[in-house]
Amino acid sequence: MTKQMHAFHMVNPSPWPLTGAASAFMLTSGLAMWFHKHSNTLIFLSMILMLLTMYQWWRDITREGTFQGHHTSLVQKSLRYGMILFIVSEVCFFFGFFWTFYHSSLSPSPDLGMMWPPKGVIPLDPFEIPLLNTAILLGSGVSVTWAHHSLMEKTHKDMVISLSITIILGIYFTLLQGMEYFNSTFNISDNAYGSTFFVATGFHGGHVIIGTLFLTVCLLRQLMFHFTSSHHFGFEAAAWYWHFVDVVWLFLFISIYWWGS
């Protein structure tokens, strides 16, 4: 057995990055096929592979950080920098959607009737489901902050309650978003308004689902007493991600739902 003379974690070979990349490739290919009226079987297969990858990868990271002690203070610092860079990349990702929306709306082309929303498009009322969803996400931001304070104050019960509330609000938001899509009078292939609306809000909805899964894993780990007030990066990363999702939604609500309508 060799003695490690540094504080870094030398990660063992893992198949999960490969299976995760394969599931992402299958998902994008499946979506392209579905958009062209082909079978959606590949989408379901990719989702199954992605969920399996997430489960196995989370399991391995939990083992390494909680039971094997590989997540030293230096490793946690590096993970925090990594999460910050990931969120910055997500900001750039959504910036492209907002750029597309404002490019189309501030100078509508003749194809759109020189007006915004384009002629024939009945936009959604921003003060119905969108406003309710805004209140839900803001409330979930408060509850996840409550969970963080409960963890720092070592009140296990309060953290479980507040984290459960956050997850329920995330699921409720997703259900309302689906209902909004189902009842909309336009679709993704109608014009620039439909495509920018569904792509921007759809990707945000996907991030909400991922964040809800992230927080659910944190809840299960908290029930097994994995987190302490000084060793809880998994939850910290989930909370950062959730706050990012909240902020993106505020920009979506103001730009696309309110100003864009």
From Swiss-Prot:
It is an enzyme of class 7 (translocase). CDD domains: Cyt_c_Oxidase_III. One of its GO terms (molecular function) is cytochrome-c oxidase activity. Residues 1-15, 67-72, 153-155, 224-232 are mitochondrial matrix. InterPro entries: Cyt_c/ubiquinol_Oxase_su3, Cyt_c_oxase_su3_dom, Cyt_c_oxidase-like_su3, Cyt_c_oxidase_su3-like_sf, Cyt_c_oxidase_su3_a-hlx. It comes from the Eukaryota. Keywords: Membrane, Mitochondrion, Mitochondrion inner membrane, Translocase, Transmembrane, Transmembrane helix. It is found in: Mitochondrion inner membrane. GO terms for cellular component: mitochondrial inner membrane. It catalyses: 4 Fe(II)-[cytochrome c] + O2 + 8 H(+)(in) = 4 Fe(III)-[cytochrome c] + 2 H2O + 4 H(+)(out). Its main location: mitochondrion. The keyword Mitochondrion applies. It is a multi-pass membrane protein. Pfam families: COX3 (PF00510). GO terms for biological process: mitochondrial electron transport, cytochrome c to oxygen. Residues 35-40, 106-128, 184-190, 257-261 are mitochondrial intermembrane. Component of the cytochrome c oxidase, the last enzyme in the mitochondrial electron transport chain which drives oxidative phosphorylation. The respiratory chain contains 3 multisubunit complexes succinate dehydrogenase (complex II, CII), ubiquinol-cytochrome c oxidoreductase (cytochrome b-c1 complex, complex III, CIII) and cytochrome c oxidase (complex IV, CIV), that cooperate to transfer electrons derived from NADH and succinate to molecular oxygen, creating an electrochemical gradient over the inner membrane that drives transmembrane transport and the ATP synthase. This is Cytochrome c oxidase subunit 3. It comes from Myxine glutinosa (Atlantic hagfish). The lineage of its organism: Eukaryota, Metazoa, Chordata, Craniata, Vertebrata. The gene is MT-CO3.
